[in-house]
Amino acid sequence: MRAVSVHPDAIVVTSLLWQTTATAVRAGDEAMLVDSPYFPEELELLPTVLAQSGFEPSALLATHGDWDHLLGRLAFPDLSIGLAEGTMLRIRERPGEAQRSLREADAEHYVHRSRPLALGQTQSLPVPGHLGLGEHELQLHPAEGHTPDGMAVFAPWLGLLVCGDYLSDVEIPMFNEGGSVEEYRATLARLAPLVDRAETVVPGHGSPSPRERALELLDEDLSYLDGLERGDEKPRLPRGRDDARQRAIHRENLTELG
């Protein structure tokens, strides 16, 4: 796990698994953690890393309901987690989904945990909407397409956009159960003006990108979606995202959307 300051009031922590990111944002004496790393050792170390940096969170957020973004409670079991209304609906309609998926991933990676995942106290957040942090407000924007639920979190006073599983420099657009190309395109359209206002864009997997690179990624993802809708079996994948794993994801996309 590595931690990088992208702003005096923002730290991005990156897991060794899939370059999964967690972002701590601060306003005055208050901080909030968005998403989570994966490995138990990373989650155990996370409270110390954030406390020593002055980012001890008072609450958690998750950009969407995929299991790898819901693990903050394992690091901070006493904190509530804020979820978009769509994510809350997904959790109610698919009880135990995140826990089952986590157990399967742990088995695949030979990972043992001292306790199971429990979401505990949750807060359903209207999206689009706002969420107070200190004297500022986080903006919550709809971000469906990768999954049927999701939100992007924009901190305008930091010029920071945390967009969930979009605009990744290591992963092509992918679609989990309930995702759709149409909604994915709509999310990219909503993200575009936010990227224009941002200094830094943090994807759910990969490295934080400056505005110019994030706009390039957005254009690349739109081009990829064009090929996907045409049914291209061997499309030209974007720079830095053309490898065996991403080719496999493309085949999965064709199957999921076919």
Name each model-derived stretch.
Residues 28-30, 79, 86, 156-158, ...:
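Short loop segments at secondary-structure junctions
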Residues 34-37, 58-68, 82-85, 142-145, ...:
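Active-site neighborhood of phospho(di)ester-bond hydrolases with catalytic His/Asp-centered motifs
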Residues 39-41, 65-71, 88-91, 148-150, ...:
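Active-site environment of divalent metal-dependent phosphoester hydrolases
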Residues 43-44, 48-126, 130, 226-228:
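Active-site HxH/HxHxD metal-binding segment of metal-dependent hydrolases
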Residues 1-53, 57, 116-186, 190:
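Catalytic core of the metallo-beta-lactamase
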Residues 55, 79, 136, 198-199:
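A structural micro-motif
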Residues 192-200, 207-258:
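Accessory terminal helices/loops
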Residues 23, 33-36, 43, 57, ...:
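Conserved N-terminal glycine/acidic-rich loop preference
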